[in-house]
Regions:
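A compositional/biophysical signature of low hydrophobicity enriched in polar/charged and small residues
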Residues: 1-91
Length: 91
């Protein structure tokens, strides 16, 4: 699985509905956070290794009503105390 982060700008008053729609309808959703700054939400998604990121964003994210803009961030490696595969990544 490959992680994908999306910053999401919502129409005024639609942030909570958009977040709920992600959780209810996009199976790849891992977490959705409300944020301060230029974007209203930060979504974390896990895609299959062969899944096309651009197609996923267009077909699954942009179709949700209330979204005004998105910014896609690709993640390559996780650094934490415990890796999902049991390995620790330090430097």
């Amino acid at each position: 699985m490959k992680p994908l982060f999306l910053q999401i700008k919502c129409e005024l008053g639609q942030t909570f509905k958009v977040a709920a729609d992600f959780i209810d309808t996009v199976k790849e959703t891992s977490e959705v956070y409300s944020t301060s700054g230029a974007y209203d939400l930060l979504g974390k998604f896990y895609l299959e290794e062969d899944q096309n990121v651009g197609r996923f964003v267009v077909e699954h994210i942009h179709r949700i009503p209330g979204i005004r803009d998105t910014y896609t961030l690709m993640a390559f490696r996780i650094f934490c105390d415990e890796q999902p595969d049991g390995l620790v990544e330090r430097g």
